Amino acid sequence: KEGYPMGRDGCKISCVINNNFCKVECQAKWRQSDGYCYFWGLSCYCTNLPEDAQVWDSSTNKCGG
């Protein structure tokens, strides 16, 4: 599984071309994962996630609310 990790506010975690920052954010939540800064979305994106990992989803987005 893969997807955008969420901060405590339910929003995607922002980044500006900093893959190492995103890798640390992903691994803090899911130890075996990897991550990078998705350039077009300016958000961290995680890979190698467990199937039950909770990631940002546009249909259940609670960011800012």
Swiss-Prot record:
Its main location: secreted. Disulfide bonds join 11-63, 15-37, 22-44, 26-46. One of its GO terms (cellular component) is extracellular region. Expressed by the venom gland. CDD domains: neurotoxins_LC_scorpion. It is found in: Secreted. One of its GO terms (molecular function) is toxin activity. The keyword Secreted applies. The keyword Transit peptide does not apply. Keywords: Disulfide bond, Ion channel impairing toxin, Neurotoxin, Secreted, Toxin, Voltage-gated sodium channel impairing toxin. GO terms for biological process: defense response. SMART domains: Knot1 (SM00505). Residues 1-64 form the LCN-type CS-alpha/beta domain. Beta toxins bind voltage-independently at site-4 of sodium channels (Nav) and shift the voltage of activation toward more negative potentials thereby affecting sodium channel activation and promoting spontaneous and repetitive firing. Has the structural arrangement of an alpha-helix connected to antiparallel beta-sheets by disulfide bonds (CS-alpha/beta). Belongs to the long (4 C-C) scorpion toxin superfamily. Sodium channel inhibitor family. Beta subfamily. This is Putative beta-neurotoxin RjAa2. It comes from Rhopalurus junceus (Caribbean blue scorpion).
